[in-house]
Amino acid sequence: MEHSIDQDTLELTGSLDVRCTAELRMILYGLIDRTPGDVVVDISRVESVDMTTLKMLAVANRVAERGGHRVVLRGCSTGVRRLLHLSHLRSMIPVEPAERADAV
C-alpha cells in the first residue's frame, strides 16, 4: 500500500489487506482528527481490498460520525461495491456515486 494526502483526501494505491490495516488505521484516524469535515478515501487506484480493510473503514466512519463527519469512499470498483453489498457493510460506509463514462 502506498498513500498520499491532499487536504481532506487520502489517496491509496496498491493492495489493501490485513498486512496494511494497522498502518492505514493510524493514517486515517490522524486525518479524521485534523480534518474539520468529511474525509474522502480515494481507492480508484487500488488493486484489491479485503474484508479486514472494509471493516476497519466502517469502524473509522463510525468514529468520524461521533465528531459530526464521515469517511467517504471514492472510486470504488464494481467488485468493491459488490463486496460492500454482500457483506452488509454498504450501509456503514458512505460511497460516492460512480462517475458515468458518458458524463465527461
Name each model-derived stretch.
Residues 1-52, 58-104:
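STAS-like cytosolic regulatory interaction modules
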